[in-house]
């Protein structure tokens, strides 16, 4: 009886190791971004808006008074 229990116990451990290894593998895979990611042109838009804001601030602070 003990041999059967030991064999089933090691099988259970192997099954658990296999499932945890499968979970570990799925967690290590890179996550692909979907369609809701940030578009590439938004960085350029942010840069241009920053430059325009700086120019407007320069005009109001230094040239108008």
Swiss-Prot record:
Transmembrane segments: 44-64
Region of interest (Disordered), residue spans: 1-38
Quaternary structure and interacting proteins, as annotated: Homooligomer. Can also form heterooligomers with other sarcoplasmic/endoplasmic reticulum calcium ATPase (SERCA) regulators ERLN, PLN, SLN and STRIT1/DWORF. Monomer. Interacts as a monomer with ATP2A2/SERCA2; the interaction results in inhibition of ATP2A2 Ca(2+) affinity.
Transmembrane helix as UniProt keyword: yes
Protein name per its UniProtKB record: Sarcoplasmic/endoplasmic reticulum calcium ATPase regulator ARLN
Top-level taxon in the UniProt lineage: Eukaryota
PANTHER family: CHROMOSOME 4 OPEN READING FRAME 3
Localization, UniProt: Endoplasmic reticulum membrane
Membrane topology: Single-pass membrane protein
Principal location class: endoplasmic reticulum
Record-annotated disulphide pairs: none
Residues modified to Phosphoserine: 19, 26
Cellular component per GO, a single term: endoplasmic reticulum membrane
Modified residues (N-acetylmethionine): 1
Keywords recorded for this protein, A-Z: Acetylation, Endoplasmic reticulum, Membrane, Phosphoprotein, Transmembrane, Transmembrane helix
Summary of the function given for this chain in its UniProt record: Inhibits the activity of the calcium ATPases ATP2A2/SERCA2 and ATP2A3/SERCA3 by decreasing their apparent affinity for Ca(2+).
């Amino acid at each position: 009886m003990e041999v059967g229990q030991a064999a089933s116990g090691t099988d259970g451990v192997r099954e658990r190791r296999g499932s945890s290894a499968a979970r570990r593998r799925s967690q290590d895979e890179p996550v692909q971004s979907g369609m809701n990611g940030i578009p590439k042109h938004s960085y350029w838009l942010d840069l241009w808006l920053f430059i325009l804001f700086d120019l407007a601030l320069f005009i109001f602070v230094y040239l108008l008074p």
